[in-house]
């Protein structure tokens, strides 16, 4: 009996010590497991791979049953003039410039706005937080100039002759009315006897005697300057 027990204990020890210990499994990041399955592809769809084409075989192209709806531009015959006008091709190795603008299609586009529903009407009511005092009533400030009638005779005279200064109409009360018949009114008087002052100028002289002397001196200076300029503009006889 003890021999049998010892034998059984030895067999148990061998059986226990003979098994390898299981290592702890590491936790993978993903909890999903991928299962690979064999796939099948019908290679006859891509043509017969075993049959080789004989290169010596001559192919006979049959005439087309109908004319294809294709368009190709005609051959362009280049002339010497056209070839010289074209810019020369850039040499090899030069970097190409990048296109700054994208190519846009030139075909007109159409959009049916009825697909997006009806148009939104503009709100005519005021916001609740806006006061009546703050609202501004906008009124159109329209203005049109008064019509001006231009006579045709005045337009023709303006085109033909030079521009002239416009003077107010002369009356009998004005100082110019007394000297209307005299031709040398704008010329300075040669002596004191030729000068006949008007009542209007006499009143001014009584009121402001100092201004009249300054004005007469300035007028005489202008006349002498004009006369001097006329003498300088005269051409010598040998020209």
Swiss-Prot record:
Q: What does this protein do?
A: Tubulin-binding protein that acts as a negative regulator of Notch signaling pathway. Shuttles between the cytoplasm and the nucleus and mediates the nuclear export of rbpj/rbpsuh, thereby preventing the interaction between rbpj/rbpsuh and NICD product of Notch proteins (Notch intracellular domain), leading to down-regulate Notch-mediated transcription. May play a role in neurogenesis.
> Region Interaction with tubulin: what ranges?
158-239
Per the UniProt entry, the disulfide pairs are none
Per the record, the similarity remark reads:
Belongs to the RITA family.
Q: Name one GO molecular function term.
A: tubulin binding
Database matches in InterPro entries: RITA1
Entry keyword annotation includes Cytoplasm: yes
Motif: Nuclear export signal; annotated at 12-24
* Oligomer status and interactors: Interacts with rbpj/rbpsuh.
Q: Which GO terms describe its biological process?
A: negative regulation of Notch signaling pathway; negative regulation of transcription by RNA polymerase II; neurogenesis; Notch signaling pathway; nuclear export
Compositional bias (Polar residues) spans? 149-159, 203-221
Stated name of the protein: RBPJ-interacting and tubulin-associated protein 1
State the compartments where it is located: Cytoplasm; Nucleus
Q: What does the UniProt record report as the effect of altering residue 16 to A in this chain? A: Results in nuclear accumulation
GO terms for CC?
A: cytoplasm; nucleus
* Keywords from the named record: Cytoplasm, Neurogenesis, Notch signaling pathway, Nucleus
- Where do we find the motif Nuclear localization signal here? 93-109
> Annotated region Disordered: where?
62-97, 149-239
Query: Any keyword Cytoplasm?
Result: yes
State the organism of origin.
Xenopus laevis
Record region (Interaction with RBPJ/RBPSUH): 129-158
